[in-house]
Structure formats: C-alpha cells, structure tokens
Regions:
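Beta-rich carbohydrate-recognition and catalytic domains
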Residues: 1-143
Length: 143
C-alpha cells in the first residue's frame, strides 16, 4: 500500500530506505544538500526507458517523490552520474551518462536547474565528453 505521506506500508518494503511506488529504481546518485533539502537522484527504469528519478527530504527519513529530473532524449537513456551545487551561478548542476539508443556507446551529458531541482535544462551542446572505449560511464563531480 502507498500512503499519501510517501511512506510505504507493505510488509516487506523498507520503512526508511527510499523505494519507488512502481517500476524499478537503482543506482542512487547525485546526492546533494541545497537550500534546506537533501536531493536524491537515481536511475528510474520506466518500461525500459531510463530516467533520473528525484526525491527530496529535510531529514533523510521522510522522502517526497518529485517528477523525474532528467528524461531520455534523442541521444540516449540517462544513466548514473553526480550532482553539485554551483553557488556562483545559483543553480544545481547534474552530470550523467548517456547510453546511446542505437550503438549503446556511452558519453557524458550535463543539465542545470535554477529552481531547486524542480525543473532541469540539458546543456545544449550535449554530449560534453565522448569516448570510443566501452564502459565510459558514471561521472563523479564534486566541489
């Protein structure tokens, strides 16, 4: 059962560990504290399309699921990465892996949010890093 306050009440579902109401989540990433909220991003597999899911908390126990942060596009699926607070530009910055639809090749992309992570704009020149080698994923950026 899914409760309106966002806490799952199923017998075998974790009570504190964040979990999705439906579909499959994995790879928590981009954990960041910004303007009074902890942000948890994760891979969110919705019918074989990989997004960055998003949840926020003020206490790391009670989580509120937000709309997906970053959606797949014509370049590819959105895989793991990291997020940082860009204080100079008053925004959050996310760096993620693209898994290209046709070739499966991996590259890195970026997106930015100016409203506490509620909406995201992908960098217009994505992908920002490419490489022909396999397993070119999971960028880690920190400040």
């Amino acid at each position: 059962m899914w409760m309106p306050d966002g806490i799952h009440m199923e017998k075998y579902r974790p009570k504190i560990h964040f979990s999705a109401k439906d579909f499959v989540i994995n790879d928590p990433n981009g954990l960041v504290y910004y303007d009074g909220e902890y942000h948890l991003f994760h891979q969110y597999n919705i019918n074989e399309q990989i997004y960055w899911g998003h949840a926020v908390s003020t206490d790391l126990v009670h989580w509120k699921r937000l709309p997906n942060a970053i959606a797949p596009d014509e370049i590819g699926q959105i895989w793991s990465g990291s997020a940082v607070v860009d204080e100079e530009n008053h925004r959050m910055a996310a760096f993620f892996t693209y898994s290209e639809h046709v070739t499966g090749r991996q590259s890195q992309g970026a997106a930015f949010s100016y409203d506490k992570g509620r909406t995201w704009e992908k960098y217009e020149k994505n992908p920002i890093l490419t490489d022909e080698r396999p397993d070119f994923r999971d960028p880690k950026v920190f400040r």
